[in-house]
Swiss-Prot record:
Tissue: Expressed by the venom gland.
GO CC annotation terms, alphabetical: extracellular region
Protein name, entry field: Snaclec multactivase regulatory subunit
Lineage start: Eukaryota, Metazoa, Chordata, Craniata, Vertebrata
Keywords: Blood coagulation cascade activating toxin, Calcium, Cell adhesion impairing toxin, Disulfide bond, Hemostasis impairing toxin, Prothrombin activator, Secreted, Toxin
Subcellular location(s) per record: Secreted
Residues of the C-type lectin domain: 1-29
Coiled-coil annotated residue ranges, if any: none
Family: Belongs to the snaclec family.
Main location: secreted
Length: 29
């Protein structure tokens, strides 16, 4: 389970980012 406002993608949690910043989101997590 992820924190509110986060999404699960391939078993990982992501905050809502623009598609351009998904790479940054991966690094953040």
């Amino acid at each position: 389970d992820c924190l509110p406002g986060w999404s699960v993608y391939e078993g990982r949690c992501y905050k809502v980012f623009n598609q351009k910043t998904w790479k940054a989101a991966e690094k953040f997590c």
